UniProtKB/Swiss-Prot annotation:
Protein's GO biological process: proton motive force-driven plasma membrane ATP synthesis
Single GO MF annotation: ATP binding
Recorded name of the encoding gene: atpG
Main location: membrane
Name this polypeptide is given: ATP synthase gamma chain
Organism: Mycoplasma mycoides subsp. mycoides SC (strain CCUG 32753 / NCTC 10114 / PG1)
InterPro entries cross-referenced by the UniProt entry: ATP_synth_F1_ATPase_gsu (IPR035968), ATP_synth_F1_gsu (IPR000131), ATP_synth_F1_gsu_CS (IPR023632)
Length: 280
């Protein structure tokens, strides 16, 4: 009977945990639906910005923001987008693993999300700056603050290169870590769509210098939004799997409990019958 009591306690514990994971799954699903509406608009916005800047860059020969494909890199700033909360499957670990695979000795981290801060601190990797007030309500204004800081770091030559590592959203069950180089822009890697030359007033060089903040802002805003929707999709999947596993475990424990209970009852009946036979 003591073992039966332990099994009953275990069943109740599994049932309670399943209720929690199911609730977390529903919350993640609600957040996923909310932020998914922003993804299409964000993709369209970022695509338009890329297209515009490709046209501008096609007419710029020399700029602090442009480099040849064989440029030398001594120090890179890695912007790493993680979540603030856990329980989201491999969402954070996949991004951090990709960073570690490419990190060089002098490189530093710009951590977005408290999980990125704690991870790279534990690895004793220098964190240049951090932002943790990131959620599904991330706005273009918040992106501008980050963008302005990054732009200043690059113009002041604190880093030769700035890259961002985020989670690319493909669909509700597929998302993968990806890297985008923000600076320098390598002209040979761009795809120019307009065959006809566009005339800029004032010249393209001046327009690039005056509007480069729009370019970097679009990248920051777009990657954070895409990472946010990937985070919620990953958490929903993780909690759904946890709930299903919990229900399966509960079923197995219930069968085990019922078998042991039946065995205990059978044993008690046998003892009663044996006692009655002995008296007769």
């Amino acid at each position: 009977m003591p073992n039966l009591k332990g099994l009953k306690t275990e069943i109740l514990s599994v049932k309670n945990i399943s209720r929690i994971t199911n609730a977390m799954q529903l919350v993640a699903l609600a957040k996923l639906r909310k932020i998914s509406k922003k993804v299409i608009d964000t993709h369209n916005y970022v695509s338009e910005v890329y297209s515009l800047f490709n046209d501008i860059i096609s007419q710029v020969d020399k700029s602090v923001f442009l480099k040849d494909s064989n440029f030398e890199t001594k120090k890179t700033l890695w912007i790493v987008i993680n979540s603030n909360l856990g329980l989201c499957g491999g969402y954070n670990s996949n991004v951090n693993k990709l960073v570690l695979q490419n990190l060089k000795t002098n490189d530093e981290i710009f951590a977005i999300g408290s999980k990125a801060v704690s991870f790279f601190r534990s690895k004793k990797i220098k964190i240049k700056d951090q932002v943790t007030n990131i959620d599904i309500n991330f706005t273009n204004e918040k992106a501008k603050i980050i963008s302005n800081d990054l732009l200043a770091m690059y113009i002041n030559r604190e880093f030769d290169e700035i890259k961002i590592v985020y989670t690319k959203f493909i669909n509700n069950v597929t998302f993968e870590p990806a890297i985008i180089r923000i600076f320098p822009i390598v002209k040979s890697e761009l795809h120019f769509t307009h065959k006809q030359k566009i005339i800029f007033e004032p010249d393209a060089d001046q327009i690039l210098n005056n509007t480069i903040s729009i370019y970097i802002n679009a990248i920051i805003y777009g990657t954070v939004i895409e990472s946010q929707v990937s985070e919620q999709a990953s958490r929903r999947t993780a909690m759904e799997n946890a709930t299903n596993n919990g229900q399966n475990l509960e079923h197995e424990l219930s069968l085990k409990y019922n078998r042991q209970r039946q065995g205990a009852i059978t044993q008690e009946i046998s003892e009663i019958v044996s006692g009655a036979n002995a008296q007769s």
